[in-house]
């Protein structure tokens, strides 16, 4: 696959996220994809990744990745890298790492969001997601959860 094709697929992926088009989102990942998020163990498999994506939308129903245009978007070989503005409002329940419910704060967040993805046969096989989790939690008035 060409770098240009991978860049187009990356935009399609974020379009699917923003539209909550989970069928397209799933089709752009290999079944055995590995996804790394800040402050959690890697997610293995598209079914688990789709569940966590749907969960995130329940906690932040208006979350959005600004990908038209991206702040940064480039490719090298099988890899793509994107940086986008990521926004949302905490309107639903979150579950902390200990399994406790965190009620909605109704606070907004805005952070840069970076995705570094490796593509094979038009699908992501490895996805690394980076964003300022501490900054996000501060904006949501949830810094006490970081201690």
Feature locations, PLM:
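C-terminal and inter-domain tail/linker signature
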Residues: 1-147
């Amino acid at each position: 696959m060409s770098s240009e094709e991978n860049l187009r697929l990356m935009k399609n992926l974020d379009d699917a996220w923003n539209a909550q088009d989970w069928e397209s989102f799933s089709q752009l990942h290999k079944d055995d994809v590995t996804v790394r998020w800040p402050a959690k163990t890697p997610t293995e498999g598209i079914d688990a990744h789709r569940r966590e994506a749907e969960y995130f939308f329940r906690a932040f129903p208006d979350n959005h990745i600004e990908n038209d245009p991206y702040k940064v978007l480039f490719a090298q070989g099988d890899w793509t890298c994107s940086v986008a503005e990521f926004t949302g409002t905490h309107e639903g329940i979150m579950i902390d790492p200990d399994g406790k419910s965190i009620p909605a704060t109704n606070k907004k967040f805005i952070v840069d969001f970076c995705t570094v993805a490796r593509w094979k046969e038009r699908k992501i096989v490895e996805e690394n997601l980076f964003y300022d989790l501490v900054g996000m939690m501060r904006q949501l008035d949830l810094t006490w959860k970081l201690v």
